[in-house]
Amino acid sequence: MSLSTEAKAQIIAEFGRDANDSGSSEVQVALLTAQINHLQGHFSEHKKDHHSRRGLLRMVSQRRKLLDYLKRKNVTSYTALIGRLGLRR
């Protein structure tokens, strides 16, 4: 259920500060968003997979925490990121 190495590298290159930046909040939020979108497709086929749904809820919660942190520390980066990812806020 995880993302491929190529997909992760592409996300890191797009949202990171450099090619090796996998730990910044922006990259972590982008990776979590990609994983969440991937799992949503899984749940359209497997409606009773409650174990994976718990993992999805943990990812959504972690993304929310990272977005709250980013909003507190750097509002311009926060607004740019949610615009690029197409999140609701």
Curated annotation (Swiss-Prot):
GO molecular function terms listed in the Swiss-Prot or TrEMBL record: rRNA binding; structural constituent of ribosome
Matching PROSITE patterns: RIBOSOMAL_S15
UniProt KW keywords: Ribonucleoprotein, Ribosomal protein, RNA-binding, rRNA-binding
UniProt-listed GO biological process terms: translation
The organism's place on the tree of life at top rank: Bacteria
GO CC annotations, alphabetized: cytosolic small ribosomal subunit
Family under the similarity heading: Belongs to the universal ribosomal protein uS15 family.
Task performed by this protein: One of the primary rRNA binding proteins, it binds directly to 16S rRNA where it helps nucleate assembly of the platform of the 30S subunit by binding and bridging several RNA helices of the 16S rRNA.
PANTHER family assigned: RIBOSOMAL PROTEIN S15, BACTERIAL AND ORGANELLAR, SMALL RIBOSOMAL SUBUNIT PROTEIN US15M
NCBIfam families: S15_bact (TIGR00952)
Self-association and partners: Part of the 30S ribosomal subunit. Forms a bridge to the 50S subunit in the 70S ribosome, contacting the 23S rRNA.
UniProt name for this protein: Small ribosomal subunit protein uS15
Organism: Photorhabdus luminescens
Gene: rpsO
